[in-house]
Amino acid sequence: MGKLLLAVVCLFSVSAFASEKAFDLKMDLSIEGKHVSSPRIVVKEGEKGTITQESNGEKSFIEVVAKEDKAPNGKQAIHMAFVVGKIANDGTRTVVSQPQIISIPNEKAQITVGENGKPEVLSLSVIANKTTL
């Protein structure tokens, strides 16, 4: 009986100290050549995080799902799938871009979306780090 009780106590103490993988993302976002924001968010691995913001009367949003991955060179990396868009006054969301970035932890990664000869539609940079919750 004493061994069973000890096993149960150990099981609960291990789960009490278990932590969830998460990612701390520091971003810079520009839409149509205008700096929109520099948000920071911590997201659980595989779960969607959402940021909405308003600047100069214009609303925008960023959604992101992050997970551990490997870079092409085999190093540990963080894969981030974004949805970036604008929010109209009536609340309607318009997606501007859905970029994906694979980043080495604590190194800046950037993606710019646009067409040749035209102003950029979107520029998103991110510094991602692993953390726990």
Per-region residue spans from a language model:
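Sec-dependent N-terminal signal peptides
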Residues: 4-14
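Outer membrane pore-forming secretion/assembly proteins and partners of Gram-negative envelopes
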Residues: 18-133
